[in-house]
Amino acid sequence: MAHHPKRKPLSQEPQKASIEALTHEGRGIAHVAGKTVFIDGALPGETVWFHYLRRRGKFDEGRVLEVLQPAPSRVEPRCRHFGVCGGCSLQHLSTAAQLQLKQVTVREQFRHFGGVEPEQWLPPLVGGGYWGYRYKARLGVKFVKKKDRVLVGFREKGSSLIAALEGCEVLHPSVGYLLPALGELIASLSCYDRIPQIEVAAGDQSTGLVFRHLVPLTTADTEQLVAFGQAHKLQIYLQGGGAETVRLLWPAGARLSYSQFGKLEMIFLPTDFTQVNREVNTKMVRRVLELLEIKSGERVLDLFCGIGNFTLPLAIAGAEVVGIEGNAGLVARAVANATHNRLENAYFEMADLNGAEWTHYVWAREGFSKALLDPPRSGALLAVQQMSKLRVQRIVYVSCNPATLARDAGELVNRQGYRLRYAGVIDMFPHTTHVETLALFEQTRKH
């Protein structure tokens, strides 16, 4: 029988380390006794005291106890819960340094996963404000027996526990400082321990809260929820099962929407996918339009189109746009948005873009000169493998995962006959390591 050497027990003594670099997740990298240690809360160039959290085979993990020599990029976190709450990971790093980290991450991912490099890096897209930007969020809810209270918020860093938050600096102001009040509201309901989450979705004029409940609500419960909505000017929705069970409780006839360039009203349900950062989204859509260089009457394919966030602005610019989406509800909302905005040059179809080949569909055989892709984190490998068959000359790819974008870029450049003209970072999620990326591809050979 093989005998494996026992790992050394975790030292409880503070350890000193010099921080050499940052991981893509924003942890400091150090070497102690010849072994790599990833240290939460530490920045490059700093000397810190830290304690070990856990030992792994090839690396250890730790957390800062004291910063002996701070880095020039270190700033005071605005949120009192930073370091405990897992919602943000970079509030201690200046916004300029955060952006630099994201740019380095994207460059490295392109090289590592795609073996490609853009001909030119675009200047990063950033918003004007770094606080209260989060228009969309999913809040955890938990009755904690030991504290005899209901907690509402994000999970603690590295834990499944809900952090006890007095407020959130990055959440939309309509909700950011209502977290304790939401906890008190749920504590007053008959099913206080059977509500696992609240979905937050803010429009331009109002904010909606979706209460997920695992058991039926009483009349008294719904009255409490309505009173809360009235007091704080919030739309209240209930969800007793899957996404199809979401229904508006109060006020009757209410809807959520946001404006695009003052010309379009985009209507959505609170559980629909919409971009987290409204200001940056507007800048992103504008840059996509610039890169695609739309000419009147040009046929454009919008894959993973959602409610039409890009489709409708493309139609306003004069393109004949076909939006494709795999979710029937989102397709219905996209069609409704085109009708609501009186656009007759935007069409929508439903298809599983990552499930099977789709070039045989009628809409795919009609031909497109340009295409836009905005896939989920898993990327769009099957879709990009079919781009050259469609003879698409120019592609803009918007991604929330630089690793899968890099993989798909490698496919387009190395096998589908495209060149990677431009790429750039979009800072959709300040104070976190999440990074949105945009890339432009042009066809180099005819098929």
UniProtKB/Swiss-Prot annotation:
GO terms for molecular function: 4 iron, 4 sulfur cluster binding; iron ion binding; RNA binding; rRNA (uridine-C5-)-methyltransferase activity. The keyword S-adenosyl-L-methionine applies. Disulfide bonds: none annotated. [4Fe-4S] cluster binds at C79, C85, C88, C168. Its EC number is 2.1.1.190. It catalyses: uridine(1939) in 23S rRNA + S-adenosyl-L-methionine = 5-methyluridine(1939) in 23S rRNA + S-adenosyl-L-homocysteine + H(+). It comes from Nitrosococcus oceani (strain ATCC 19707 / BCRC 17464 / JCM 30415 / NCIMB 11848 / C-107). The gene is rlmD. It comes from the Bacteria. It is an enzyme of class 2 (transferase). S-adenosyl-L-methionine binds at Q275, F304, N309, E325, D352, D374. The keyword Iron-sulfur applies. One of its GO terms (biological process) is rRNA base methylation. The active site is at C400 (nucleophile). Belongs to the class I-like SAM-binding methyltransferase superfamily. RNA M5U methyltransferase family. RlmD subfamily. Catalyzes the formation of 5-methyl-uridine at position 1939 (m5U1939) in 23S rRNA. Pfam families: TRAM, tRNA_U5-meth_tr. This is 23S rRNA (uracil(1939)-C(5))-methyltransferase RlmD. Residues 7-66 form the TRAM domain. NCBIfam families: PRK13168.1, rumA. InterPro entries: 23S_rRNA_MeTrfase_RlmD, MeTrfase_TrmA_AS, MeTrfase_TrmA_CS, NA-bd_OB-fold, SAM-dependent_MTases_sf, TRAM_dom, U5_MeTrfase_fam. Keywords: 4Fe-4S, Iron, Iron-sulfur, Metal-binding, Methyltransferase, rRNA processing, S-adenosyl-L-methionine, Transferase.
